[in-house]
Amino acid sequence: MEKVYEELDEVKAVNEKLRIDYRNKTELLENLKKVQNEQLIEIREARLVNEKHGFEIEEKSREIAELKRANEELQRCLREKDSVVKRVNDVNDKLRANGEDKYREFEEEKRNMMSGLDEASEKNIDLEQKNNVYRAEIEGLKGLLAVAETKRIEAEKTVKGMKEMRGRDDVVVKMEEEKSQVEEKLKWKKEQFKHLEEAYEKLKNLFKDSKKEWEEEKSKLLDEIYSLQTKLDSVTRISEDLQKKLQMCNGALTQEETRRKHLEIQVSEFKAKYEDAFAECQDARTQLDDLAGKRDWEVAELRQTLSMKDAYFKEMKYENGKLEQENRELLGSLKELQEATIQGSGNSALSKLKNKFRNLENIHKNCSANLRSKEAEWSSQVEKMVEEINDYKLQLQSKEAALKEVELELENCRSSTAKMRLQYEEISIMFLVLSRTVSEAQSRLANAKDKQIKDEKREGNCYSLLMEQLDQKNAALAKAQMEIKEERESVACLLKRIEMLDLFENQNIQMQKEVERFKEMVEESSRFQTQMQEKMKEAENDYEEKLLQVCDALDNTNIDLVAEREKVVSLTRQIESLGTVKEKNLVMEKETQEYKEMLEESEKCRVLLEEQISQLESDSNENIRELCSKVDIAYAKLAEEVEKTASLVRKSESIDLNEEHRQRELDHYKEMLEESTKTQLLLQEKVVDVENDSKRKLADVSEALEIANSELSDKTSEVFQIEFQLWVWKSIAKRLKAELEQNQNLRKRVEASLLEQVGVGEAIKQEKNELVHKLKVISHARSSDSEKKESLMRDKDEMLESLQREVELLEQDSLRRELEDVVLAHMIGERELQNEREICALQQKDQDLCEVKHELEGSLKSVSLLLQQKQNEVNMLRKTWEKLTARQILTAVETESKKMMIIELEGEISSLSQKLETSNESVSCFRQEATKSRAELETKQTELKEVTTQMQEKLRTSEAEKTELVKEVASLSTEKRNLLSFISEMEDGMLKLYDGDTKLMKTLERVTQCCDGFGKENNNGETIGSPRLAMKHEEDVVTEDRSPFRPLNH
């Protein structure tokens, strides 16, 4: 007993130790719970950090909205600049008004010059009056000469009288002397008169020459004035255009400078944002490093705890072994005691030990049941954990793929940022070059303006010189030499002026070339700016999308971390419940190993995340570069789109034509349907008429049969002939039945073939739909793959898809119509074949009846009356056959003996009634078919209405699209026209300048020719002088020649 008590004490001591171990394990579990709580706190802090990142992203989105607002403000600034441009246009209008005032002043000067020309013409009129006076004087001299001649005649008469009266020689001598003197005077006066006439003719010729020269000079001067005015107008217009262009260039340069400044600001903002994002990434990396360090520390603590648990587990195993051995020893000792001491004083102690033993057995039994239940629970939990682990592995793989994509995008973003920096540097260089070129252009324009002012002053001086020249020419019509000198001076001035104008035109041409070059530079810069804006927008969108993706990835990782930590919490709880169970310890070991692997994988994922972030930065740069290249490709595609718009316009026109053709076809089909409905109505009316006629004819046939029965009772000798006729009719009926069966078989075959064709058509439609679906799937896949590349082509792809759908619908409609046409054609063909066959059968019957008639007429003359009656009956039946359209078979007239003929006729009447029933059934079938056809027609009409409405809607949409395309084409055509008008204006200006140059050259050639002519005349002795000097010279010559008459004049 003492040994049992000692053993019990030892068991108690072992139990106390186990309790102490349990307490220690509970403390360790509480520590693990605290660690888990700390981890949860860290996770919450990480969530807060993520929320902060989300707020920062929202702030960035707000900043983007502010940038958009800034963009709108820039657009407002552009509008204000447009208003400024309008004001500048108003100023230009004012300048034009000033130019018009100057033009009016020039017109006033022109009028003054014309008044000077009028004064010169008045002087010419005075000279003409003087010439008339000289002519009157010459006529007076001629009268004096006539008077002198009369006096001479009278003197001669007196001399003759004196001679007659006086015969003195002295008087005769005197008279002769006087006569000789008078004759000499007369000769001298005649010579003088001749000289005067010659001088007068010379003066006339000189006056005419001077008048012609004056008119020529006047016309030349007027031409020069007009040419100079046109040149001035063209020069003023060119100068105004250049000023406008310069103002536009200055405005564009200011706009470009403002844009450049805004772009620099945006670049700086983007740099700051990039630096902030980079700093945030670095912070995230540091946080990840801190988290990794904490995880390493936690893993080390977990490993320590696991090692401690392993040691405790081994101790527990050892203690359990000891306890089992002790239990066995106790059981053996108890059995010995039960055998040894059945009776004695140890009964009470044995009863106590038995009770304790029983309690221990119950406890062991309960422990085994609990262990089995827990083993089942843990096996199910292990399976669930394995499934969850597989799921988490798949999630980790998907996240790794997503992280790789994010890394690629970051690399693209980095490459694109590098490209953007290079492009911004190129833009800055371009702006510097443009600023320098603009400054040079402004300096050149200032010099050109100074030259223009000088040229205007010179032109004013030239106008004053021209006025002086006109005054001098008007005052010096009698002084040709002075005019020649002045003309030479004017020629020299004109030559100088022409040289200056040539220089001015060359300068203008150079300035135009420079302006065009500046225009091209401005256009290129504007295009480049638009490209850069689009690229910046696309880069912003990509950056936002990538940030969203990164945020989503971070959220997913945080969720995964939370799930993992929750799993850790559940595992710690499970560890609490798995205190002393071996299987639970094994499961814990497996789970710890798995979690070690998970931690290692998480560390790998963290490393991969860091690598992916670096790759994403590089991908972002590459994406920006690719976007730049894509934008260039898009601008290249814009030209193709313009061509495509033209082709679409052409296609729209062709579609309009096709739609008109289809509308016509629809109208034609509608007419066909109306005609078919009308034909069906007519057929129904005919069927009703046929029924009525058949009833009437049946009544007539019954009456005729009664008459035939009454008449055939007396005539039995004709039975065999009538039996022959009946046999013929039976053969004909069999033939008709065979033909009907053939027709029905043919109809069934045709219907089967039509159904097969319909099935084939539906299969083709299904295949087409499947192909269309596949094409749509492929197009969607391609569009999803190339959304970034072909964002501009989506609208046109949708247009093409809608056009394809319309084409498919039209094809389906055409197939339906073709099938309907085929069905109608088959039905009509069947009816026509049936009609033809019935007609042929009736014709054959007619022929057979005619043959029978001839045979009966040849063989039986006595029965002619009956045959005639039966022929009439046969004719009536033939008419009924023609009207029933191959659905009714008439029976022939049967004649037998009285009883046999009556029986056969009753059988024929029954057969006729059955056939009438069949005909009624066929009529009812026809009616049903007619109703079905009506229903089908109504459905088809509804379908046609729906199709027409759809086509009208499509036509409306196509018309709207057509109007939009026409508007776009009109806008493009207007732009083209504006460009062509601008080019034509430039060409007109150049042509005007060229015409002015040619006119000036012509005037110079004329002036030089005139100068050469005047020089030659002066070199030839200055024969063309003033008329007065010539007269004086001639008078001196005459006086010198007539020197002997000087003493006689005294």
Curated annotation (Swiss-Prot):
The keyword NAD does not apply. Transmembrane segments: none annotated. It comes from the Eukaryota. Residues 1-420, 463-627, 692-981 form a coiled coil. InterPro entries: At4g38062-like. The keyword Zinc-finger does not apply. Keywords: Coiled coil. PANTHER family: OS03G0691500 PROTEIN (PTHR45287:SF4). This is Uncharacterized protein At4g38062. It comes from Arabidopsis thaliana.
